[in-house]
């Protein structure tokens, strides 16, 4: 999933801007005064505002108009935009306050931590889906239209049900089922973690299960080498799904990290607009023109 709220066809990089004239420009235009008004003492908002504005000096008409459309939506639906921004902060902070990733040496610990984080993330994803369903009709911009349509397409009820089912199976597993293929020298290769057969049975079937032909062996309680080998096989199987879950966690975290960064700029714009309203001063969305046209028209300019 992509955010695409600062650019119509890509996520914003928001890397540090190194302009040779940035210090002079900041001082001459008192840009820090603007950034502080947008940030309201939030260091993250301050930095995003600074980087976004300076990196936007070379934006084309399409990008400027695209952002203005989204900005107008933000002004009309400020509480909704702030709620989405708060969700992104909540998810990122939940990662910082979890035990996830501390015991990465042990696959079982990675799996347990990944399951816990996915469940936290699912709760926040469901909140985002609810906000989308309740407010999608209130937004008119191309940016938010694409964003909300993506949320409804990707985060369906079936998606949530399927993920929850997988998590329940992983958390309440009764042993593990792993398949192998035989390689050279009859060494096991291409391990795969399989889903356990979890057919519902009545009490009679549980007491007298149908017999099926299978081959098995038991390890002697004192066979330390055998127990160690079995433990390694167990960890290998768990590691397959643990890595997959960890990648899913990282994907969700990346999405909300980008969402926070891009909405931080619009949150700063909302902060600035609200302060101008308190001062009862006007604001507008200027019409951009090419620099070669040398058009410069304004009215009701004021000092703040």
Roles of regions detected by a PLM:
Residues 1-181:
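Conserved amphipathic alpha-helical "coupling/scaffold" segments
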Residues 1-8, 14, 262-304:
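Conserved NTPase motor "head" modules and their coupling/switch loops across ABC/AAA+ ATPases, GTPases
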Residues 217-247, 253:
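Extended, charged coiled-coil "arm/hinge" scaffolds of SMC/Rad50-like chromosome-maintenance ATPases
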Residues 126-133, 168, 185, 189-198, ...:
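Charged/polar positions within long, soluble alpha-helices
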